[in-house]
Amino acid sequence: MSQTLRNSLYGGGDSHIYYDLSIQNNDNAGSAPVPLVFEEIRSNPYLTNPDDYMMTVARFTLDTPSLPQWIPQIMTGQANVNKTVYSITLQYLGFQYQEYLLFSPSDLSAPTPAVPTTTQDLSTSYYYGMSYTKVMESVNSAFLNAVAGLNALVVLPLLTAPFMEFDPYTYQCILNAPQTAYASSLANPIKIFFNTPMYNLFSSFNSTYLGYTNITNGKNYQLTTYTNNNTTTIGGVIYLQFYQEFSTIPLWSPIQSIVFVSSLLPCSP
């Protein structure tokens, strides 16, 4: 690791002292990540009375792929380390089937976490979600499994499953549902429900809140699948498209703050 240090003084007097620090990792060997460490040994102190000063990080930029974009909540009290609390429920003619999302890890080098008997094991980076596309894959797998599960209970008018996609330009998600089976204008449409944890991830979809009292199989929110002019045809199937009204991606971030702690960081007047 090479370090390029530049300290400079802006403005007049000693009331505002700015220290610019740039640290670069020039490792081209593709080895394991190098810990960021700043260490400097000096024979004379920069400040004779450091207690007279207060320090703050005015601004910083951090380019790192190691910060997770989301960390799923895993269901406790069961043996599957990838089974989350987020569920999709499909209902047709009074029959219903609930399917939970399964987490797909991005870091295959992390050890498998302990079984979530009572708590979720967050001691490693196993649950660090690094891709929004992987979330869409989990959602779409849940839709496929829900369609198959419901069709085992009652013959469905169409076996083509809804699917969700992520728009990287708007950071909004789009739900696509086959018009001939899911349009709310049909006499007997297939209905889509999210449980509360699932809805919290995608809360800007048009939906109806059904509450908690006497609610079974995660039917807390019913998505509104009305016929509109937003359609797309894929493989001969006409899909209704439902857009999020605003992006909920910022709500997914598990990062609350980045804290700088140091008792040896010098300030140069």
Task: Name every feature range the model reports, one short phrase each.
Residues 1-269:
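Flexible assembly/topogenesis modules
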